[in-house]
Amino acid sequence: MLNYIVWNANPVLIDWGIQVRWYGLMFAIGFMIGYEIVARMFRHEGAPERWLGVLLIWTVAGTIVGARLGHVFFYEWSYYSAHPLEILKVWEGGLASHGGSIGVILGVLMFSLFTSKRSPLWTFDRLVVPIALVGGMIRIGNLMNSEIFGHATDLPWGFMFVRSRQWMEMYPGQAVHPTQIYEALCYFALFALLMWMYWRKNAEKRPGL
């Protein structure tokens, strides 16, 4: 009996001329669910309906631009500096969640400054709930990409990421911790806690909580 899991998932879900990658799909699903969560919060608090659309534009634009530029500058600058037009091909993959986080922060600041005229904390208090969910979805995308794994392990749930060149270079023949799964579970648990705090503990009445 093997004491490890061989992970050979294809990061591309559909390839019909234009690729649909698992990472991008997880990002999109998280966004759609997050939109509905924030919409319910806004209705619950009587916030102007148009705010939701404006916030969506700012956060989507900030996330996509930030995630793309984060990947470009942090991971593949040598390639994209020589092929700058390739930066525009977001549909081919190459997004970094930390870059997306920076983009969201900037988007919220713009929304607060030009639309809501409220403290950015008011908006962040509502966005952190779906962001925790999106974080978990993104880590599932990382799992499908065979990236962001942990150190070597002999535990029975260790993964061998056979599609990963980095794994082959760093841990050839060794199982590693599936840290994507660990993080995803933590994000989903945080999401559940934040949902409970908002809807059951009236956390919306305590800005910055």
Task: Describe these PLM feature segments.
Residues M1-L209:
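A feature for loop-to-transmembrane-helix boundaries and adjacent hydrophobic helices
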